[in-house]
Amino acid sequence: MMPLYLLGALAMSLCIAGLIEFQLHNRSLSSIPLRIHVNGTRGKSSVTRLVAAGLREGGLKTFAKTTGTAPRVIDPEGKDRIIHRLRLPSIGEQVRLLRYFASEKPDAVVIECMAVQPQYQWIAEHQMIKSHIGVITNVRPDHLEEMGPTEEDVAYSLCNTIPNEALLITAEDQKPDILKAVAKQNNSQVVCSDPTSVSQKEIDLFTYIEHRSNVAIAIDVCEKAGIDRQTALNGMHKVKPDVGALVVWDLMIKESTYKFVNGMAANDPVSTLGIWNSINDRYGLGKKTCIFFNSREDR
């Protein structure tokens, strides 16, 4: 049995190591002038890419990190770097990446929240990132096992990433009052993005189908960072879409053309219906529409 003094020495060593790690992390954060933390149910990866593209177009040296369908680091040139993990995903990954970003002396970092459990979402924002601008894209009935069981519970869980004495930008239209109340408690201002402010012409310039709400959020974030709307949009229209982005392919089969819509990244009923309506408005869905449904084992 280990003597008590050895246990005490070990505990003291761990405490000292933790304090040193904490100080080093705070030093890394202080080296990043603008930190943007993106959370929400749907569209986190797309908004992260759009914001980073708008900031780059405005001349800010920007790093971004997505954690969606395929995790990526996006460098200041807009190039994707695949994140190779040797173990299961952990929010500790964010600390290591922030340290790397800080060493590159960026003007801004845009980082997607990778935490699901409510307590880890709080840690991700209030201990790890301490953002200047927080984003909650929307609140939808997803991850109900961890954040539910109700949509209201999901809203409160996502509110764990609302920053203190900073700014929250959201396009949430179902539970906005919850977000505003928590932001007020945190002494943070709220900007509600308006999807109708984005024209169809601006949407049509994307190489894939982007949601108006995502673009509206990204424009508001960029404007708060000092980038004008048109400059930000110019950058967004050049963005490389996330792997899970809504893409439509034309398939030629026996001299007939079929449209295949990849909407499988939307894994909650509300978002799936939204995609259905969007595609119906754009292309029209007749009797010859076929649905491929991908059901996860844990759903």
Regions found by a protein language model. Name each.
Residues N26-I32, A53-G134, N138-A155:
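ATP-dependent carboxylate-amine ligase catalytic core
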Residues L251-F260:
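Beta-strand-turn-beta hairpins that frame and shape the catalytic cleft
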Residues M1-N39, S46-A53:
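Short, basic phosphate-binding NTP loop
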Residues A52-E57, E223, N277, D281:
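Short, well-ordered alpha-helices that flank and scaffold nucleotide-derived cofactor binding pockets
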Residues M264-R299:
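Active-site beta-alpha connecting loops in nucleotide-dependent enzymes
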Residues R72-I74, Q119, Q174-L179, D298-R299:
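Short, charged/polar "capping" segments at the starts of alpha-helices
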Residues A64-T66, V135, L167-D173, T289-N294:
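Short internal beta-strands
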Residues P33, E104, S131-M252:
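Acidic, Mg2+-coordinating active-site environments of NTP-dependent enzymes
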